[in-house]
């Protein structure tokens, strides 16, 4: 089979391992890495395959950097119209919380934290905001403890001992 059929079989295998039509023994959801690098058409098809097996499965996409060098994150709304993902990993939340609670020189005021979080809520349909995958760190970012002792860095920019000899890994 081609790649599409291979992925469809994976969805069936993990969504209903014994193939009895009852997805209770399968996975409850899917986290899709670097999802912005795959076309919207494929994700629409993927959602259909998932819903065929388990209409209640949670689909979360990692839609992150639109322009990493300039610290611009995607507005993930195009993936969240009800035909692709249920949610995305909310790195915009993580960056705002880091700036408010951990940064020192570049700390933001409570009003700015409120503005940033309100912007995230406003960018998505009302039913999407409550199910976004809010996170403070991940396998792609430095650990929260490392962020705390290395304040005032851009989220996911030059945050490792390899890139900065003075970086304190926790």
Task: Report the location of each language-model feature.
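Short, intrinsically disordered, charge-balanced linker/junction segments flanking boundaries
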Residues: 1, 162-170
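Active-site-proximal helices and loops of the catalytic beta/alpha 8
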Residues: 9-12, 19-132, 151, 157-161
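Hydrophobic side chains within well-formed alpha-helices
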Residues: 3, 132-135
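Short, solvent-exposed beta-strand-terminating loops
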Residues: 141-152
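Chitinase-like catalytic core of GlcNAc-active glycosidases
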Residues: 1-8
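Extended catalytic-interface subdomain
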Residues: 134, 139-142
